[in-house]
């Protein structure tokens, strides 16, 4: 897959079902949020991932034990100048 350019928006389908199989019921929603963060960081090649409150609420909608099996999200990547150089930041919102 090609690298996402800064300012570009891409839609991803995050397969949360993978998490549901290996995590105890009472940890599923928090682990799903972490999985979304890791998935987007890996695919968008971003150092930081900022998840919107809408995405968080969608994951927690049915409680801690039953997050959705998959989630369609819109990702926008920006580059920012910091002390250590350029940093890629991915902003995640519902698609």
Curated annotation (Swiss-Prot):
PROSITE patterns: RIBOSOMAL_L31E. It holds the Pfam family Ribosomal_L31e. Keywords: Ribonucleoprotein, Ribosomal protein. GO terms for biological process: cytoplasmic translation. The keyword Ribosomal protein applies. CDD domains: Ribosomal_L31e. Belongs to the eukaryotic ribosomal protein eL31 family. One of its GO terms (molecular function) is structural constituent of ribosome. This is Large ribosomal subunit protein eL31. GO terms for cellular component: cytosolic large ribosomal subunit. SUPFAM superfamilies: Ribosomal protein L31e. The gene is rpl31e. The keyword rRNA processing does not apply.
